Amino acid sequence: MAVAPNVSDLQSGVVKASQMARAALEHTLQHHQLQDFILAAILASIILLIIRNSMLSPLRGIPGPRLAGLTSLYEFYYDVIKNGTYAHQHPKMHQQYDSTIIRISPNHVHIADPELFAIGPAGSRFRKARYYYNSIGMSTAIGSHYDVEAHHRHRSTMAVGFSTKSLQAFDPIIVNYAREIMDIIASRGLKGTPVVLSHHTQAYTIDVVAKISFGQPVGAMHEVGDHPPTVQAMDCFSNHFNFTKHFPYWQLILPFMPTSAVKRIMPGVHYIKEVGTRLITNLIEQRRIEGRLDEEYQEGKGAIFETLLKPNPKKQYPAPDLNGLVEDACAFLVGGSDTTGLTLQAVTLFVLRNPDVLCALRAELDSASEFIRDSFDIHQVSKLPWLTAVIRETMRLLPPTPGPLPREVPPEGIRVGKYFLPGGNANKGPGRQPGDAEFRPLSPAVCSLYITIPASTQTQKGSSRSVGWEKAVRAWWSGGTHSVVDHARVSDASTSCAYFVFSSSIICGREQHTDERFLACRVAWHELLAFLALLFLRFDLELYESDETNLEWTEHMFTRIRAPVQVRIMKDRWA
């Protein structure tokens, strides 16, 4: 029998339903209001950013792509989405806007004026741009210092490790490792098997740098397989750079992430930091075993990093903690191997693509074989004109650091043509004038060095050699001025603007000696001489699936080429 519903129960149910509906409606309205507020805030921020960068910026009158002046996403597109090709756009922009100065991002200008290369040397008023040099997580390394005084203390403390006496002690290591890597190349190139040259050039430079810096090699020369782990990590390390440059806050997040996640996200950085940590701890442990923990660096006997392990009151240098030492170690390993290894590959390719140069170089090396094959005399080898010519011209054509290498404009600003670049957009209220203790430039303009790879590196379709390379090499060989190539002043300057201590790009363009302003440039120079002299004296080589297109490059702080150079050994003349 059905029971009629109670009227009061029905009324109560209706009231509850209406209350629930009202609450749901209010929640929906509040939610939409919050969304609208967030959206309005984002739109307002974008509008304010556009107004600031387009109408209020002191750089607003400098020519350049309008979108580049409005947002750094323009640079991000070429750096990350287009894989390090923004440096290719800069020469085109200078031509398009017919200007020696262009605006390439909201607070960043690019200058095509060789006279301004004076901003690069040590002691310059133009400090290194922190956003660029510190983005990979090595802010305390010698190549990344923003503070000029801190850099001077760091550099002067290490200088004894690069004295003439110390460097003379390193030469046998450089030569012996070069001989060893030649034997490895010979064993892996048996019966015409292609040799991936980058595996051996980078492994050689990695182990040399590790041995002279920390007293032991990494062991990279003996790694096998299609993807040797240390060489692969070096490639990955620089490939991270363009992303971290735009998102520097990754450094705050990684310490809180599981190691397995860090390995997946930043494999190159993780691997190189592990290697650096191992080398530093092994060096300290070895000194402990030998009872030398309190000893100073012994000039001509010790490893370079022993100069950094103890405070140096005379130099006002406080010894860094383990993290600081590891950052320096990573900078040494990456900067000392990637750059020189690339140059060794490129020289080999260019020489093998130019038979006349190869013939002249081989004749020169044959005539000098008594101080190459038997008892290697690095000083005699350094005087060989053809050998030094092919190295210098290759470095001019393919600098290992092709990017802008930005510097901050000093507080007083500078004038470039009709444009004034301020030292910062500061709030110049009371007590906030330049020179006052409280003065803080909020956003200093960044002045980017114009480092270009000249047009002569580009290959003509169907051409069997680099346009003008042989002619330019002959100009170096003859000892004349480098007038055969356009942009000579720019490219000469570009060979002295790399800041990593072992970089092979710091060899002077015009002189027979290296630039002593840069620590360890002679180490890189001797690595190049030893490796190439032994390679071309010992082996008859041919290129394998390699030509100038292998050297098509992108910029990830260092030069990254399209594909590694491969060679075949046709004959081992010493077998």
Curated annotation (Swiss-Prot):
Glycosylation sites: 6, 83, 242
Sequence positions that bind heme: 521
Keywords: Glycoprotein, Heme, Iron, Membrane, Metal-binding, Monooxygenase, Oxidoreductase, Transmembrane, Transmembrane helix
Gene Ontology biological process terms in this record: secondary metabolite biosynthetic process
Enzyme Commission no: 1.-.-.-
UniProt keyword annotation of RNA-binding present: no
GO MF annotation list: heme binding; iron ion binding; monooxygenase activity; oxidoreductase activity, acting on paired donors, with incorporation or reduction of molecular oxygen
Transmembrane segments: 37-57
Xref: Gene3D superfamilies: Cytochrome P450
Cofactor: heme
Cell location: Membrane
Superkingdom classification of source: Eukaryota
UniProt membrane topology term: Single-pass membrane protein
One of the record's GO cellular component terms: membrane
Database matches in SUPFAM superfamilies: Cytochrome P450
Reported function: Cytochrome P450 monooxygenase; part of the gene cluster that mediates the biosynthesis of oxepinamides, derivatives of anthranilyl-containing tripeptides that share an oxepin ring and a fused pyrimidinone moiety. The nonribosomal peptide synthetase (NRPS) opaA assembles the quinazolinone core with D-Phe incorporation. The first adenylation domain (A1) of opaA loads and activates anthranilic acid whereas the second A domain (A2) is for activating of L-Phe, which is then converted to D-form by the E domain.
Family note: Belongs to the cytochrome P450 family.
Protein name stated in the entry: Cytochrome P450 monooxygenase opaB
Source taxonomy: Eukaryota, Fungi, Dikarya, Ascomycota, Pezizomycotina
Gene encoding the protein: opaB
